[in-house]
Amino acid sequence: MLNYLYLDYGGKAKYRAELKYSLISLQAELDPARARILVASDAPEVYRNWPVTVMDIAPHVRDWSGGGLYYHRIKPALVREALSRFSEPVLFLDSDSIVRPGFHAEATEKMTAAVVMNRFEKQNPIPPIRGFRTRLPHLGEYRYDVAHSWMYNSGLIGMAPQHLPLLDDSLAMIDALIGRAKKFPMIEQFALSEVLRLTQTPIAEIHDSFLHYWQGRRRIYMANQIRKTLSPEWDDLTPPKEWAQMHYWKIRAYNYYHGVTRVLGAFQ
């Protein structure tokens, strides 16, 4: 069974609203007999009435975040925990996302032969760490390579239990870089991408059936769409009548309106 995994920590309403919207879009794709939705949270009681399996991560947040130094570290640590606990494939989804038709079929097919990530981002992703070296538990000596180092976006992370050693190495690399996390907040996805590169693990991208709207303008637009189209009742998981579409001019127009109203509101 494929386990879809969401993460909620910190208790911020805007992020929980994004999770709700994404999860509702995912539900429309799934046969409950063939897939499970997991929600990992430091406030598990929030999800007690949802048709999901809840993972209580409150006891782990401090350790998984490197003592609070880098909260993005929780993501690979959580994927590792879910793989170990369920001994089945796990597909982590960032909450700022919309699942589109065909996603489950695409994910199921691609995860049979590859690790799934959202999309390729760039070569030589962190030039200032040129010369960085560390030792990883499975791969051994690592050196940042300006010619070959790369990074994929980790809005999706799809892995199977046999990939656990890859996560051990990813977490070790993150820990070696954690002192630079404030300057380079993407080290979580960089570390996993590098371990996949060095182990020559196949990577499959999913971006047509998975919309990841992490950029600022699109996120502001989506906050308004979620507010307008979902029930304010937390446990009401009724889908919106129409799913949000990321049309460029609609996003620009709403952000202009949003900016003007904020400025005017400051003078009232």
Predicted regions, residues:
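A conserved donor-nucleotide-binding helix/loop in the catalytic core
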Residues: 21, 62-91, 101
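C-terminal catalytic/acceptor-binding lobe
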Residues: 207-268
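Short, flexible, basic/aromatic active-site loop/helix in glycosyltransferases
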Residues: 133-148
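The conserved acidic donor/metal-binding loop of glycosyltransferases
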Residues: 94-98
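N-terminal anchoring/stem segment of glycosyltransferases
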Residues: 1-64, 84-86, 255-268
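Conserved glycosyltransferase catalytic-site signature
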Residues: 16-19, 69-72, 76, 154, ...
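Catalytic core and acceptor-binding pocket of nucleotide-sugar-dependent glycosyltransferases
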Residues: 146-233
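Conserved donor-nucleotide/metal-binding helix-loop-beta segment in metal-dependent transferases, i.e.
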Residues: 99-135
